[in-house]
Design a protein with these regions (language model features):
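A solvent-exposed interaction/effector surface
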Residues: 1-161
């Protein structure tokens, strides 16, 4: 059983590359986005984890869109390939999964667990999209090591705190 937690994510400035693509194109897009971000930062360390934001369904029939993001400092400028946007502060519900759980179709269970959790149901209505927040590089870890968080931004709290 997956453990669902919540956390606060402060407002942050993000480098962004967004593309409409199908599931079979995701790995190449991720490699390209990571390389473009690294080249643009020119050796400077990112200030947050690499994330994939799913603005729509990405599978064999649907093409997203999918957005690769990386938190950046205020001095990073947009380019032809990289947009810059500010994401509002928000709370999110998440579960952390291993590389084995990350493989398709096992990853769908993690998405379902978070999406159907009491936290997400009670605070639905966020305008932000679900995401994968990466903790490790897939090629650098074994199947039993943690790879990413599956996260759903939460809507505003209602009722007493």
């Amino acid at each position: 059983m997956l453990t669902i937690q919540t956390r606060h994510v402060p407002a942050r400035r993000l480098m962004s590359i967004q593309r409409r693509l199908r599931a079979s194109e995701t790995d190449a897009f991720v490699r390209e986005a990571k390389n473009v971000f690294a080249e643009h930062l020119r050796g400077a360390a990112p200030i947050g984890p690499f994330s994939l934001v799913f603005h729509g369904v990405v599978d064999h029939d649907s093409d997203g869109p999918l957005e690769a993001t990386l938190a950046c400092s205020d001095d990073v400028e947009p380019t032809e390939l990289i947009g810059i946007r500010t994401e509002a502060a928000h709370d999110e519900a998440f579960t952390t999964i291993t590389k084995a759980q990350w493989e398709y179709p096992a990853i769908l269970a993690a998405y379902d667990a978070v999406a159907c959790s009491p936290e997400v149901i009670a605070r639905s209505g966020s305008r932000l999209s679900c995401r994968e927040v990466y903790l490790a590089e897939p090629d650098a870890i074994t199947d039993d090591e943690l790879i990413c968080d599956i996260a759903y931004p939460l809507g505003e709290r209602t009722g007493p705190r």
